[in-house]
């Protein structure tokens, strides 16, 4: 079976990057370029739905905290996009994530709560935040975030870098350009603060495109346990 990724390459990447992942600051993460095969990444870009393609997009317009559109309604997706998402929820891919992160017993979210396809346009942003930690339908702990970017000819002056912040939400520790076929994987906790907080300076009609997928376990380490909470924004839920 052909996947959108090169499985042998991914498995080697997991072995090579596992130590760097667990030791990364401000929290465990890795940035992987050329994540999907070149052909698959190009096909995803070509088939990535636009804002007016007849798909239901959820609108997020909370000024200063989140301005974007997103959808997880896979029944409306082009077949190629739907198949790509299924590959990212497949057994071989989850085994890669387990090897990379050291987190066992991961499973995918078929509902893609909060995930799926994301589009952010001119003046859009995503404030610095820590994600919700509990999936009420799966009754499971959120453990891993995966973002893959599909932004050809991206320029630094667009101001769309993903920022990873310190666990006290005081300082930006790392900035990551959302360039084409780059993946960012990180461990999700109640203090894994991140976002792209500056309004995008994109040309009118251009978008910051990404696929976001999240992975879960039924248990998590005791030192990470907190009561279930929704997304926590710096400046709204904490200073």
PLM region spans:
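Non-heme Fe(II) oxygenase catalytic core, chiefly the N-lobe of the double-stranded beta-helix
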Residues: 46-51, 76, 80, 85-142
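Fe(II)/2-oxoglutarate
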Residues: 1-25, 230-239
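Non-heme Fe(II)/2-oxoglutarate
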Residues: 5, 9, 18-101
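Histidine-centered active-site/metal-ligand motif
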Residues: 29, 129, 194-196
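A structural signal for well-ordered alpha-helical scaffolds and beta->alpha junctions
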Residues: 10, 37, 41, 81, ...
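A structural signal for short, well-ordered beta-strand segments and their strand-loop junctions
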Residues: 31, 107-110, 116, 185-186, ...
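Catalytic core of Fe(II)/2-oxoglutarate
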Residues: 133-142, 151-239
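Eukaryotic charged/polar low-complexity linker/IDR segments
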Residues: 145-147
